[in-house]
Amino acid sequence: MSICIKDQIQNMNIVIGCTVGCTYCYARNNVKRWHMIDDFADPEFFPGKLKMMEKKRPQNFLLTGMSDLSGWKPEWRDEVFAKIRENPQHQFLFLTKRPDLLDFDTDLENAWFGVTVTRKAELWRIDALRKNVRAKHYHVTFEPLFDDPGTVDLSGINWIVVGTMTGAQSRKIHTEPEWAWPLADQAHKLGIPVFMKEDLAPIIGDENMIQEMPEEFNKVLEVQKSWKK
C-alpha cells in the first residue's frame, strides 16, 4: 500500500496567500471556503504559529502549503529562519514557483528549498533555484506533471517528488507513466531519492510505486516512532 506524504510531512501555514495565481490552486479555494484571510493575493504572516517549532518531538514541516516563498517579505523570512536555527530537531521544507524573484544565502542545515515544475517549459526554475537560493538542500516537486519534461539537469538536487492532478480536474488530465518513470530513472542515476505521491498509484500501479525520503526525513520519522512507545 502506498504511503500518503501528508502522514510524513506536516503543514505549518505561517504565511497564507500567494501572488502567483495558478488556475488549479487548491490553497486559494480552501482559503476562500474557510475565510482564512480577506485576499489570497495579499499574503499574510502569522508569527504566532512559530511556537509550533518549539515542540521537542521531531517533525518534518512544509512551511509553504498555503503560500509561495517568493511572496514572503524578507523580514518574515528572517524571523522564520531564526526560529528554524533554534530548532534543529525538525526538518523544514519550502516551495516556490518563482525562484527568479528570490536572492539569498543560508547555511541552515535543516531547511530544504524547492521549486514546483509542472511541464518542460518550467525546467528553468531548477536552474534559477540553484542560482538564486544558495542553500544546503534542494528539492523539486514535479506536480501536477502536465507533460514529459524530458532530460532534466538534477545536479545538486537532494530529493524529487512526482505527482498528478487531483480533484475535479483529474478527470481532464493526469500524469502519464511514461513521463514519471524517466524522471525516477534520472534521479536514481544520481543517487537522488524519489517519492511518487499516492495519487499516482491508480495510474502506475500500487506495486510499482517508489516512495523514498531523504535520510534526514527518515531519521525524524524513526525518532517519532520511539516517542510513541
Where are the language model's segments positioned?
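Auxiliary Fe-S-binding modules of radical SAM enzymes
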Residues: 1-9, 146, 151-229
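Conserved Radical SAM active-site core
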Residues: 1-112, 120-134, 149-154
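Structural alpha-beta junctions
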Residues: 86-92, 134-137, 184-194
